[in-house]
Amino acid sequence: MTNPSTKNTGVSSGEQLASDASPASPPSPRPPGAHLSRRTVVTATGASALAAGLTGASVAPATALSPAVAPLTAPAAAPPGTDPTAYTTVARAIAVYDEHDRPLVPTYLKAVENGLPARRGRATKRVLVVGAGPAGLLAADLLNRAGHDVVVIEANGNRVGGRIKTFRKGGHEEGEQPFADPGQYAEAGAMRLPGSHPLLMALIKKLGLELQEFYLVDVAVDDPKKQANRAWIHVNGVHMRRADYEKNPAKINDTFGVTGPNRTRTAAAILAQALEPAHRLIRGKEGTALVKGWAKVLKKYGHWSMYRYLTEVARLDTRTIDLIGTIQNLTSRLHLSFTHSFLSSALIDPKTTFWEIKGGTALLADALYKPVKGKVRLDRRAVRIERRAGKVRVHTVSEDSQTGKGGVTEVFEGDEAIITVPFSGLRHVTFEPPLSYGKRRAITELHYDAATKVLLEFSQRWWEFTEAQWKEALNSIEDKLYDKYRAGAVDDGAYLGAHESVKKLGVTLPDELKKSFAAFRPVAGGDPDAAHVRGGGNVSDNANRFMYFEHAHPMEGCDGGIVLASYSWSDDALKWDSFADDERYLRALAGVQAVFGRRCEVFFTNKCKTQSWMRDHYAYGEASVLLPGQHTELFPDVPTSEGPLHFAGDHTSIKPAWIEGALESAVRAALTVHTG
């Protein structure tokens, strides 16, 4: 199956994102002395794909507030004191090359598929793995199969997987039923898996997990091979199908005040053209030439924010940047590193096929956990790591011991350790003796960003309805109710959860909730036409920002489905994080109604879930999304070993927020321990 060919719906993070030739990721962020602000202040993916990049783009045209001049191609030099070797180091990390500019992916693939190489005549080691996310679990499995004595130490008391987390019933964590329909599940974390990530694809195949296509772009309900492009763009009071926007961009662009040639160009096309100066430095290159190309990108733009690049290189005015930020999901990260958004934008591409694991991404965590389950110690949070007399000691506490009301403390000893805890979490771990200055600085300063999801359950997949199906469903509740909604004549919350399919799930919504919801509902108005789509993402400038339909493929035995009502990052996410979980759901439903119409409320079950990764005290944020300059100032010290201490996790790769980055780091660390 191939992804429908159409414009992309946004620039990603997470996932935790590029050609088949090499891995890629984005996958979900102050120069010295600079004021850290939204507009003055992007960490990467596989480079070969980006070298292929976007083609056919030309110099950015003049805009309302900028002259018709070519983009600048020679920004100011990097700040004094920047280590010149850092550019090459990071360039190789982007390309996943060794010090001789040879690809590392083939070696990593062999390890994933066949295990670590034989170690003739060398003693086995006792290895402590701190953290049971995908990096920790894979590293532990590889070392365990190679004959080493492995212990995995995990702070969470009931599950493994890190930011691979599925709201589901059962699983290794024995989760309670999260939704009214016992067959439903939804992703709190990683949800879309790029086919261009070779280690992940190989691992999934090896583990025998079933994939189905994740429709980043919506497809026809009756023919999933046919693109629909009927997803909504709802900004500045304009309601428009994406296909219509591509035919007539001016209708939305005018609302931002965009003039000149860009008035009639889509936000995606404007962004692609804006990134062309950077793409020219890497396009068509490989080996040492590719490394040199990436080093040039980093020297020219690595100390810049995305906003600075768009204004000073692409010469876009603020109105056009506002357009791009809103439609392409860049607004909340304009102040972060240009590098991150540059790489991310090239990965979220119509030519990239995305997949999801049938049954939930947590099935991957289950499969990684199974062979090392007896080696994993849950409910053991590392608080102190010592190196003494040739040994590593990890001091841990149970979660309840942190309240001062008892609990358990335990010390684990080994020859070496692989530490996969996010650096934001290591800020609260004591090292004795102290780590190197570069490592300590990275732990202190590495920027972690926020990401928040709000997921709502509905008893029917109303987004797939035709108008005829809407009419039948609504009139089954009350005669001519369909006409009332279409005319905007329903001005209270009386019909919240009113459809019989909600009651069949054992749900009856209280009148108090309906009265409360009336205050959140959008102002009465005629409902828009039926969405009639499967999968895809919708854009809004309301607090929800981006909306996706979970599990585009119908689930056997389930009539309803889950809507990712809000998927937001950075500042957008923090505005949701201020609310308690239960306070988010009616607000998110109102945001969905503003885009799709109020009638969807009749299928609302009020069985909802939400995940804030910044508030998660195991994750400490969505991912390391770096600030300008941090790739060359901090990253070279992130993955390096400190004696018997080795570091892994997606933050130690140039694929933060993506499982592929975690897997790359796991193999790297396991090989270091095994062959050292």
Task: Describe each PLM feature range.
Residues 439-466:
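Central beta-strand plus flanking loop segment that forms part of the substrate or channel wall
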Residues 2-126:
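Extreme N-terminal leader/targeting segments of oxidoreductases
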Residues 419-436:
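Flavin (primarily FAD) binding-site architecture
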Residues 71-114, 146, 391, 429, ...:
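Conserved flavin/dinucleotide-binding core of flavoenzymes
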Residues 405-416:
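Core beta-strand elements of the Rossmann-like FAD/NAD(P) dinucleotide-binding domain
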Residues 115-270:
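N-terminal glycine-rich phosphate/pyrophosphate-binding loop and immediately adjacent elements
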Residues 276-384, 400-403, 425-430, 451, ...:
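Active-site/ligand-binding neighborhood in enzyme catalytic cores
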Residues 78-87, 98, 186, 205-206, ...:
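Mobile amphipathic helical/loop "lid" adjacent to a hydrophobic cofactor/ligand pocket
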